[in-house]
Curated annotation (Swiss-Prot):
This is Large ribosomal subunit protein bL35. One of its GO terms (cellular component) is cytosolic large ribosomal subunit. One of its GO terms (molecular function) is structural constituent of ribosome. The gene is rpmI. GO terms for biological process: translation.
Length: 66
């Protein structure tokens, strides 16, 4: 059977944890930051776990991740 291709766009956006979960960046942290509080901007700078309902979709895009 041939090797499966990784979707390169997904490979740049997701990271795998040791337990097999996927991490992602948070939205709303690119521009228009003047009116957002420092606390909110710190929070938006952290990584988030991909929801369990989206886990299968991400894992199909990244067949060799974990």
């Amino acid at each position: 059977m041939p090797k499966l291709k990784t979707r390169r766009a997904a490979a740049k956006r997701f990271r795998v944890t040791g337990s097999g979960k996927f991490m992602r960046r948070r939205a709303f942290h690119n521009h228009l930051l003047d009116h957002k509080s420092p606390k909110r901007k710190r929070y938006l700078g952290t990584m988030a776990v991909v929801d369990e309902r989206d886990h299968d979709r991400v894992s199909h895009m990244l067949p060799y991740a974990g």
